[in-house]
């Protein structure tokens, strides 16, 4: 693919603000797990409904991820990033005043629209403002926005919930997001990506062209398998710890936060490896296999607590290898610079598909069997699919690199 940067140099200020926008968006994922039991109790929501509340922010990402990327290619990622962040803030504000489970679902749906828009736009901006030399590293850094934002807000949520209620938490997140939207608006003022033109008929053309890249579609599916396992673990681990170990709210939030920091470490390790010419399929394969093996330990009833914690931390590292590899593959499979946003949208659609069905699937298995150990077969199956998909992409990636 030809160089999509606006200039020969990397525009670091714009890059870091876009990265921060992704972190702020991910905070709205991390605010939920510590508050979910309180929300379920106050809004009279069952376990399965709680799973859908956890996943609803991903529904629109699945449905609109590709469209968000294509629109970003058409009207500019800067505009989409700012509007996306403001939409997240609006959804959080509505959620702060929710009086029923359905109202909370609506607020998470609105947050999902903004999450999809801002994260697709953020990746597109970073791709355009980085030089060829810096791009793989920058995209690897970008892939850590979810674990950093998620982990930070897990701890922040637990602290806020210790002195106030979940509605205050939602309001605080809304204000933080509005602040970053304003910052992004001013810092990116005057930046315009090269080639930001095209007609409405090109939107459909970009979508069709990206879907024709079979390797990219399989990478997105592998990303979905990762996301289903990862978000399920993060969404339900606090509940699991409370039920199994009678953990406090702060401790139940701290352990997932530590796992997420290890996940971010996996992101950066993967970015380092890609910068040294390791193919994406190798990282996808190692990550999927490692996630499957370590989850057997996390949910096993036959090993000690220390060993379970060790498996959970390794789960974070192996899982972190996949997002960086998937995002990095965008530069491999995108046919033209004008389609970067659309291809990023395909990856966002994939990860949100996994985030959508993962938590409800795990909750359904847990509710039906009455034991967390029974979810082993569900997560092992997801990991197995990811392993197979990664192997299938091997020749496709080699062919794409040779073009």
Placement of each model-derived feature along the sequence:
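Juxtamembrane intracellular "pre-TM" segments in multi-pass secondary transporters
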Residues: 2-8, 191-219
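Cytoplasmic helix-loop-helix junction between adjacent transmembrane helices
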Residues: 107-146
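C-terminal transmembrane helical hairpin of 12-TM major facilitator-type secondary transporters
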Residues: 280-326
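Helix-to-loop junctions at the C-terminal end of transmembrane segments
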Residues: 65-76, 267-279
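Helix-breaking motifs and short loop linkers at transmembrane-helix boundaries and internal kinks
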Residues: 44, 76, 97-103, 131, ...
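Extracytoplasmic gate region of multi-pass secondary transporters
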Residues: 33, 215-257, 264
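Conserved MFS/SLC helix-loop-helix module at the cytosolic interface between two early adjacent transmembrane helices
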Residues: 63-99
């Amino acid at each position: 693919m030809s160089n999509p940067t606006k200039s020969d140099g990397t525009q670091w200020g714009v890059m870091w603000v876009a990265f921060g926008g992704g972190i702020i968006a991910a905070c709205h994922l991390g605010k939920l797990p510590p508050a979910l039991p309180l929300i379920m109790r106050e809004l009279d929501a069952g376990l399965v409904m709680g799973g859908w509340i956890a996943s609803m922010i991903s529904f629109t990402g699945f449905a609109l991820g590709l469209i968000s990327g294509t629109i970003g290619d058409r009207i500019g990622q800067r505009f989409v990033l700012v509007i996306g962040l403001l939409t997240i803030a609006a959804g959080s504000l509505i959620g702060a005043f929710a009086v029923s489970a359905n109202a909370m679902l609506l607020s998470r749906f609105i947050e999902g629209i903004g999450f999809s828009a801002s994260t697709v736009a953020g990746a597109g901006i970073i791709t355009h403002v980085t030089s060829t030399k810096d791009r793989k590293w920058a995209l690897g850094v970008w892939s850590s926005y979810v674990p950093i934002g998620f982990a930070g807000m897990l701890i922040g949520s637990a602290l806020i919930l210790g002195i106030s209620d979940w509605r205050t938490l939602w309001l605080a997140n809304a204000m933080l997001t509005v602040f970053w939207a304003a910052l992004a608006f001013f810092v990116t003022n005057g930046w315009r990506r090269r080639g930001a033109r095209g007609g409405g008929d090109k939107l459909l053309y970009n979508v069709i062209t990206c879907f024709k890249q079979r390797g990219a579609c399989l990478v997105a599916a592998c990303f979905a398998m990762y996301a289903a396992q990862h978000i399920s673990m993060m969404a339900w681990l606090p509940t699991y710890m409370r039920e199994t170990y009678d953990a406090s709210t702060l401790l139940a939030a701290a352990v997932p936060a530590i796992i997420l920091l290890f996940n971010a470490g996996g992101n950066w390790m993967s970015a380092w490896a890609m910068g040294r010419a390791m193919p994406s399929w190798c990282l996808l394969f190692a990550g999927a296999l490692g996630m499957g093996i370590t989850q057997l330990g996390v949910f096993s009833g036959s090993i000690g607590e220390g060993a379970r914690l060790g498996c959970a931390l390794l789960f974070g590292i192996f899982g972190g290898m996949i997002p960086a590899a998937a995002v990095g593959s965008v530069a491999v499979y995108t046919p033209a610079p004008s389609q970067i946003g659309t291809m990023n949208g395909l990856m966002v659609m994939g990860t949100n598909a996994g985030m959508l069905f993962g938590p409800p699937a795990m909750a359904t298995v847990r509710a039906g069997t009455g034991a967390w150990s029974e979810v082993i077969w569900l997560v092992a199956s997801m990991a197995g699919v990811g392993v197979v998909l990664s192997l299938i992409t091997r020749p496709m990636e080699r062919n794409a690199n040779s073009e």
